[in-house]
Amino acid sequence: PTVSGKYADVIENNVCKNIGFGKPSVNDTNALTSGVGCAAIFAGMGTSLPNTIVKNNVVQNCVETGIEGPYELVYHNTVKNTGENSVARYTGSTEAIYIKLTTEFEQKYIGNTIETRGLRCFSSYSNRDDEYKGIYILNNSVNLENTDASITCNYTRSDIEINCKKIKKIVIENNAGMMKDKKSVNIYTDKGYVMDYFSIHNPCMIGSVPEKARYCFNINNN
C-alpha cells in the first residue's frame, strides 16, 4: 500500500484496551443515542490533517468505535470487541472502523482483522454536498458477531455501509468473513449521481448499491 504526497503522520504499534467502559444499569436495555461513546484511535474532520497512516495497532474492548478518522491508509490493525455495551444497548454508531470522508485523497483500508458486537465492521456517513475521492476496502477479515436474541435492535446491521451524496470511487474486494445470509454491503448515493468506478467482489449478500457508474466491475451477489 502507498500514500500520496511527500510526507505522512503515522499512528502505529499501539495497544488500546477497555476504552470508555460505562456499565448500564441493571435491566437497562434502552438504546444509547447516536454518538454517545468514544473511539480508541480518533482524528477529527479537517482539511489541515496530513495524509495519515494507521497501522499495526490493536484495539480491544471499546464501547463504540475502534478507529475513526479521515485517514489515507488504515493497514494491518486488529480491532476486537467494539460496540461492547451494544450487546445490551445498541447505539446508532457502533462501528469497528468509521471512515470520515475527505475530498483530498482516496482512503484505503487494507488487511485489517475485525470482530465487533456493534452494528457494522466498516461504516461511513456524510450529508455534505462535497464529492469525495474514494474508498478501498480490501483483504480484510471481518466478523459481525451475533448478539443476544432477546435484545431488540432498531438499526440495520451490516458488514459495510457507506452513505454519502457523492463519491467518485468505491472498491470492496477480497474481504473474508462477510455475511451470506443477510445484506452484507449497503452503499447509498444521491439518486442520479454517476460514480467514476464501482466494484464489489466478495462472497457476500449485497443490499443497496449506487444507481449509476461510468465503470462497474465484478458486482457479485452470492
Please provide the spans of the model-predicted regions.
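Ankyrin-repeat and related helical/solenoid repeat scaffolds used for protein-protein interactions
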Residues: 166-209
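Extracellular beta-strand/beta-solenoid scaffold signature
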Residues: 1-4, 19, 23-52, 61-68, ...
